[in-house]
């Protein structure tokens, strides 16, 4: 949202009665292929500038969460860098009551991305030991990388900070594809998750025309 001034976002939120759930750190130079910065050893200064910007912006619009994007990297130095940057982000966000999220991305859509599995994310959360660090569980990515969504949700619920969904394999509306979302939403409710869930799919046409799937849930 960084191209829009925070006061303008606040005005839109007040007008619609909505709250801002979260935002991402800047991805970097997208034209050069960046998809996050925080696990790239030689770009720590840029990563922390992006974290500072995200924290300040999130605080200004009262956003609840920030997704710190790792970027394309691998190996022990990348792990060390990402861990240090997550600690930095958690410390900066904590004073504003903001939660930091990490999200595994599938290696079909984002080959070379540092964070790809829920196991890796869970281990990072244990290592960082920050009260405001949590997992963004995207059903689309987890299904493509691991499957077994019901058990993954049950196992990881204590560290889940946000849930997103889209159909697999086309990342469309959740009324088709290989995931039974009626079952998944029931599991999420049974596990005691009461926060909002995010429909992060690719609409075919105007988004407003693709919301028919919601009728059975509202």
Task: Mark where each language-model region is.
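Conserved beta-strand positions in the central sheet of alpha/beta enzyme cores
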Residues: 1, 22-24, 67, 101, ...
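Active-site-proximal loop/turn and secondary-structure-junction residues that shape catalytic pockets
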Residues: 2-5, 26-29, 70-74, 104-108, ...
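Short amphipathic alpha-helices and their capping/turn segments at secondary-structure boundaries
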Residues: 3-21, 52-59, 83-94, 148-155
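Metal-dependent catalytic neighborhoods of phosphoester/phosphodiester hydrolases
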Residues: 6-11, 79, 207-210
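N-terminal small/glycine-rich loop or linker at the start of catalytic domains
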Residues: 24-38
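Active-site acidic/histidine proton-transfer and metal-coordination neighborhood
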Residues: 35-134, 144
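Histidine-acidic metal/acid-base catalytic patches
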Residues: 53, 62-63, 87-88, 99, ...
């Amino acid at each position: 949202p960084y191209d829009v001034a925070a006061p303008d976002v606040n005005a839109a939120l007040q007008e619609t009665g909505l709250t801002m759930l979260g935002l991402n750190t800047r991805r970097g130079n997208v034209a050069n292929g960046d998809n996050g910065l925080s696990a790239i050893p030689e770009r720590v200064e840029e990563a922390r500038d992006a974290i500072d910007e995200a924290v300040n912006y999130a605080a200004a619009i009262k956003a609840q969460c920030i997704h710190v994007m790792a970027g394309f990297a691998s190996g022990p130095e990348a792990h060390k860098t990402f861990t240090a940057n997550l600690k930095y982000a958690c410390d900066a966000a904590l004073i504003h009551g903001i939660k930091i999220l990490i999200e595994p991305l599938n290696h079909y859509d984002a080959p070379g991305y540092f964070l790809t599995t829920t196991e890796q994310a869970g281990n990072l959360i244990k290592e960082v030991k920050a009260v405001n660090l949590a997992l963004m569980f995207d059903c689309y990515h987890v299904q493509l990388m691991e499957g077994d969504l019901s058990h993954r949700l049950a196992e990881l619920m204590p560290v889940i900070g946000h849930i997103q969904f889209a159909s697999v394999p086309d990342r469309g509306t959740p009324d088709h594809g290989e995931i039974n979302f009626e079952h998944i939403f029931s599991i999420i409710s049974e596990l005691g998750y009461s926060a909002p869930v995010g429909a992060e799919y690719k609409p075919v046409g105007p988004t407003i025309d693709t919301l028919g799937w919601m009728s059975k849930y509202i």
